[in-house]
């Protein structure tokens, strides 16, 4: 054994004199000079008596953070004019130019063609059905899916996501469309009573109701696309981090109830005004039950038959998706069968069923959005833009991670933004990625974005040739297709027990967002969910977990004594961990929980002062014959510990209030003879702490590990016990 090891063993706690591991307050302290009872622990400099040398790190030189220089440097980099710079800019904005020349035809073409055809077949009935949800004619849903698939092929970086119509966005578009139709006077029920107030708001009479509806829808889509491109340009994609999985899940489920409610009138064949605004779900159900006696029996029977076919087949597709090479396109079969039955059975003429009506072929001339509508729909477009890009970016990143490639979040925002801006000139409404169709696309062998071109070709065939054949298709069939596609969101309730076990807070966020989205409105529900989530984040840091730590045997690791067994508590030392940032919100909680788990220095100090007042007075006669009063302070009971080590590893940052709190805690404890050490401080805590918490010559109060702080506390206590004499100290005035 080396001499160094022998010295360390000689000074180990096991061999120390009894009582050296606990702090015992000096018994003799002058009453009138209580401030001298404070122990300047920082004065115990490292010496050869300490077992472990202190760690000293030299910080990196701080870079020049001059904002003006930073902006100039960025502008110089962005404004460089060269062929390489121009090429990189173009290739970065149009990713298709990068990957298409490298396309492996033999390896990828079969999977891309198969997946594109299947998704296209599924999109035909869904596009027609979701058009009703958006308050549009069926042809506009086909336009939307066609242009979105084609544009994302050019601008997108994800190989697997399917961009097209999404039910939640269609619902939000439909609510804006209904409101603007009512304001413009197209609602015959309310037009007469509001005639005087609508004189200046009526659109050109050459534009009928469906024409004005798509003008409103395309205008909202244009504004939402501009927002998304702006977010990509200014790189504010961080907004999506406030939309947690629990929040998005609750929002989608709540909005699904609203979608389901809006489709009930089609299932029953009722002609009802579409409710919008706060409480629309409840209002719609009231209208349904008031008019239930007007149910069209033919539509009801058709709806039930379609449900009996669609639901079991969808379940079979889900259960046997690993064995099926492609999902059964049951929706297309149902649409074809229902159209044939309606046409040859003359259901519209005989029973008055509601049908899709004329669907034109080809494309309409492009038309600019209504610029006068933009101020009225600008606020509505914000929520639509955020939901659209959040879902698109999250899905693209999820599938990229699954298949081992990378996507550019900002480019995805550009892509989805232009998937809305460009189609808005071609009578389209808002699009985004959709999970259900993306899963189908992936499972059927999709390899690259070429799959989107095949989907667009299928839709183009329908637009040019097949669309008029859906004239006799009942709207009840489209309503059933919409409702059946909501089953994934509505089945989220079965995941709640597992979510509750994992995180109760996330479950509460899910419920609050779901209920507010369903019972109030989709926009207010989203806002409520975001605000409540942020409140929960603050709540988690306001009263975070805090615990005393113990040493794991035969290691230098410390863990919570309330969570693990067989941990060693070091005599005379309390190690405290606070699992949250220390800032103005939780500074009082930090003090209260620290005092509760150790001791309250304010109360101890008060007790010491109270005991000090009980002093022994005795009169003595000096040699000069003058009486003098000598005060003697009674020795206090020794405290259980002499050091508190605060583990700062989980404290991400400090604000001014947090620094003042640490200074106050240190001052209070040192007033009763207990030193406070900080350990495992990250740079964001250590840098402000070094300047505010302690002076320059007190930097040895900050440690890089809890174990280092513990050994310093033991050694400094041993050194102090060596130099501080025991026994009462009588001081006379």
Swiss-Prot record:
Region annotation (Disordered) ranges: 1-37
**GO MF terms, alphabetically ordered:** secondary active sulfate transmembrane transporter activity; sulfate transmembrane transporter activity
Q: Which residues are glycosylated?
A: 194
Q: Where does this protein have compositionally biased stretches of type Basic and acidic residues?
A: 1-18
Q: State the family named in the UniProt similarity comment for this chain.
A: Belongs to the SLC26A/SulP transporter (TC 2.A.53) family.
All copies of the STAS domain together span 563-714
Q: What does this protein do?
A: Sulfate transporter which mediates sulfate uptake into chondrocytes in order to maintain adequate sulfation of proteoglycans which is needed for cartilage development. Mediates electroneutral anion exchange of sulfate ions for oxalate ions, sulfate and oxalate ions for chloride and/or hydroxyl ions and chloride ions for bromide, iodide and nitrate ions.
Q: Name one process (GO BP) from the record.
A: chondrocyte proliferation
Q: Which GO terms describe its cellular component?
A: apical plasma membrane; plasma membrane
Q: Which UniProt keywords apply?
A: Cell membrane, Glycoprotein, Membrane, Phosphoprotein, Transmembrane, Transmembrane helix, Transport
- Residues annotated as coiled-coil are none
**Which compartments is it annotated to reside in?**
Cell membrane; Apical cell membrane
Superkingdom? Eukaryota
Which modifications occur after translation, per UniProt?
N-glycosylated.
- Per the record, residues carrying Phosphoserine are 12, 16
The way it spans or sits in the membrane comes to: Multi-pass membrane protein
Q: Which Pfam families match?
A: STAS, Sulfate_transp
Q: Mark the transmembrane ranges.
A: 113-133, 138-158, 214-234, 237-257, 379-399, 415-435, 453-473, 519-539
Q: What is the name listed in the Swiss-Prot or TrEMBL entry for this protein? A: Sulfate transporter
Q: Which reaction does it catalyse?
A: oxalate(in) + sulfate(out) = oxalate(out) + sulfate(in); sulfate(out) + 2 chloride(in) = sulfate(in) + 2 chloride(out); oxalate(out) + 2 chloride(in) = oxalate(in) + 2 chloride(out); bromide(in) + chloride(out) = bromide(out) + chloride(in)
């Amino acid at each position: 054994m080396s001499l160094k090891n022998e010295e360390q063993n000689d000074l180990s706690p096991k061999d120390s004199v009894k009582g050296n591991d606990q702090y015992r307050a000096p018994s003799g302290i002058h009453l009138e000079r209580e401030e001298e009872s404070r122990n300047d622990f920082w004065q115990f400099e490292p010496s050869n008596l300490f077992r472990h040398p202190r760690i000293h790190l030299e910080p990196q030189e701080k870079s020049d953070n001059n904002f003006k220089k930073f902006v100039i440097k960025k502008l110089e980099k962005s404004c460089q004019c060269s062929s390489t710079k121009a090429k990189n800019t173009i290739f970065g904005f149009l990713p298709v130019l990068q990957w298409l020349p490298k396309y492996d035809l033999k390896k990828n073409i079969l999977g891309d063609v198969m997946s594109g055809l299947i998704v296209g077949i599924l999109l035909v009935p869904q596009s027609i059905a979701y058009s009703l949800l958006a308050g549009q004619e069926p042809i506009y849903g086909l336009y939307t899916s066609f242009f979105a698939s084609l544009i994302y092929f050019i601008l997108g970086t994800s190989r697997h996501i399917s961009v097209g119509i999404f039910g939640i966005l269609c619902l939000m578009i439909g609510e804006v469309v209904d409101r603007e139709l009512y304001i413009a006077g197209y609602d015959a029920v309310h037009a007469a009573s509001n005639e005087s107030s609508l004189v200046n708001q009526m659109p050109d009479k050459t534009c009928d109701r469906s024409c004005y509806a798509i003008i409103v829808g395309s205008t909202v889509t244009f504004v939402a696309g501009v927002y998304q491109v702006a977010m990509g340009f200014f790189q504010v994609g961080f907004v999506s981090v406030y939309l947690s999985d629990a929040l998005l899940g609750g929002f989608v489920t709540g909005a699904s109830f609203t979608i389901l409610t809006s489709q009930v009138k089609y299932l029953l064949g009722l002609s009802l005004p579409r409710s919008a605004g706060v409480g629309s779900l409840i209002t719609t159900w009231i209208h349904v039950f008031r008019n239930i006696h007007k149910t069209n029996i033919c539509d009801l029977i058709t709806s039930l038959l379609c449900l009996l076919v669609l639901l079991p087949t969808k379940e079979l597709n889900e259960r046997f998706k690993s064995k099926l090479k492609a999902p059964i396109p049951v929706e297309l079969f149902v649409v074809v069968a229902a159209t044939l039955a309606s046409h040859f059975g003359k259901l519209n003429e005989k029973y008055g069923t509601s049908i899709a009506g004329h669907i034109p072929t080809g494309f309409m001339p492009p038309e600019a959005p209504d610029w006068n509508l933009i101020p009225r729909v600008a606020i509505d477009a914000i929520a639509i833009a955020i939901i659209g890009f959040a879902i698109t970016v999250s899905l693209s990143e999820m599938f990229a991670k699954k298949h081992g490639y990378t996507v550019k979040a900002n480019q995805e925002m550009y892509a989805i933004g232009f998937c809305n801006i460009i189609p808005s000139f071609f009578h389209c409404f808002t699009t985004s990625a959709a999970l259900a169709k993306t899963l189908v696309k992936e499972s059927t062998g999709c390899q690259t974005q070429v799959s989107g071109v095949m989907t667009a070709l299928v839709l183009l065939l329908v637009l040019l040739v097949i669309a008029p054949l859906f004239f006799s298709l009942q709207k009840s069939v489209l309503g059933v297709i919409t409702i059946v596609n909501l089953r994934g969101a509505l089945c989220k309730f079965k995941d709640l027990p597992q979510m509750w076990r994992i995180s109760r807070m996330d479950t509460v966020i899910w419920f609050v967002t779901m209920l507010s989205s369903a019972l109030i409105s989709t926009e207010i529900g989203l806002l409520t969910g975001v605000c409540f989530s942020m409140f929960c984040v603050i709540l988690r840091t306001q009263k975070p977990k805090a615990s005393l730590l113990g040493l794991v045997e035969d290691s230098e690791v410390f863990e919570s004594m309330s969570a693990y067994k067989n941990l060693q508590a070091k005599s005379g030392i309390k190690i405290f961990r606070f699992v949250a940032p220390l800032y103005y919100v939780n500074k009082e909680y930090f003090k209260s929980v620290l005092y509760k788990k150790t001791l309250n220095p304010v109360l101890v100090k008060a007790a010491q002062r109270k005991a000090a007042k009980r002093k022994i007075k005795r009169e003595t006669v000096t040699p000069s014959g003058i009486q003098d009063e000598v005060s003697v302070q009674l020795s206090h009971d020794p405290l259980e510990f002499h050091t508190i080590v605060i583990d700062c590893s989980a404290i991400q940052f400090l604000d001014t209030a947090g620094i003042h709190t640490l200074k106050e805690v240190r001052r209070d404890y040192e007033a009763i003879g207990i030193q406070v050490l900080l350990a495992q401080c990250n740079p964001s805590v250590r840098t402000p702490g070094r300047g505010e918490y302690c002076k320059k010559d007190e930097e040895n109060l900050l440690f890089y590990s809890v174990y280092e702080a513990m050994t310093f506390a033991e050694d400094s206590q041993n050194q102090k016990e060596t130099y501080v004499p025991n026994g009462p100290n009588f001081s006379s005035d």
